[in-house]
Amino acid sequence: MARTARRTVPLALVGTLGLGGLVAPQAARAAPRTADPLPAIERAAHPLRSTDPGGSTKDLRPMGRMVGDASVVGLGEATHGSHEFFTMKDRVFRYLVEEKGFTTFAQEVSWTTGLRFDAYVRGGKGDVRELVHKELAKTPWDTKEYVELLTWMRAYNDRHPDRQVRFMGNDLNYPEIGAELFDGVEDYVRAHDPGLLPRITGLYAPIRRLADGDTYMARPLAERKKLAGNAREALDLMKRLQPSAADGEFAVALHHARSVSQTSTIYAFPFDTPEGVKDGMLYRDRLMARNTAWWQRHTGEKVLLSAHNAHVGYESYDPRYPKMQGAFLRDRLGKRYVSIGFTFDRGSLMAQSAESEVWKPRSVGAATRGMNEYTLDKVRHDDYFLDMRTAPATARTWLAKGRLTKSIGTAFPDGPHKIRLAPSHDILVHLHRVTAAHRQSQ
């Protein structure tokens, strides 16, 4: 995306940021003296054998008990560009698939990209490295770690043809609204209500011509609002069809129409104004939660949802964004949604900067006194996790208070930000050191 568009269209930015780069860091303040939480955190901590997938998963069994009967588990990341966050997600997903009956890896990528990845892991043609680069080149996820995840998913499906794992994208369609979405809607209408087809194709025609996200966003706001109206009308017409309750083909076609409408709607927000950014980002988190819940209901299967900590959590650290995807999912699913957040003490990540879209390794020093990670890193285990809902009282009290915490999106430097860990997530994974992810182009 062009630099000017990147500054004036925060949705393309925030689509890969969490909330990083949008909030000014706050000065650290001396905390009042309280009971030392370290012994209580030590008692609650379960050590991790490794952050790499493969090998024994015995150390993850306590996490499995913490997850319980949840149908959707949100698994965050404290940066978008660290190797260990990618590999831990891969490792946890494999465990949840093999031991807890999960089948879907959902990600804050477009519905279009999700369809293409899902086709690949279920035996579709193509080279996985080229596919990932084509779909994710503008995002933090064009990485060798992501390729390895999709490679494992495909290999798993080769071994388990009767219970396959799936990939789902729950976000707006960027960098493009895939032609398969329009085709899916029009093909269904052609087969079931051909008299409606001319109206549907007429409504979609101008949106098809602007399916590329950057081209779309370069159009005047008035035109984008008109196109959003077209997409909403097409969705409303689809909703009026009367298929049988068991018509899975209709459910997918309807979601294609919903996804086109969601994308056209968010492209019609005035992202050159603070209020437009606020309203657009609230809409985005709501739609991601809705799409995830729809998929879980449609498939009847359990879902691991991968996103930044800010998007899988319950609290936002920025008052301009008062409600995030995790909070919307909790509203929809109650205790059937569980949020897992990450912290880390030091290390490196791949990130862009405010001046350049080039991805480079960036270093992050150890946490300083008064930060959440300063205390968390004193636990005797380098890498561990704990259930913040059931930790000893002293630990819960400490975890409930806001302190400066590392939370980094695509733009570096970023933060730290004042975050309350326990109100934000159910389970916390702390890693001593992280390293930069491996982009395919490097």
Task: Indicate residue ranges for each PLM-predicted region.
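Secretory targeting and sorting signals
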Residues: 1-30
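Structured catalytic-domain cores with a bias toward divalent-metal coordination
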Residues: 5, 9, 31-442
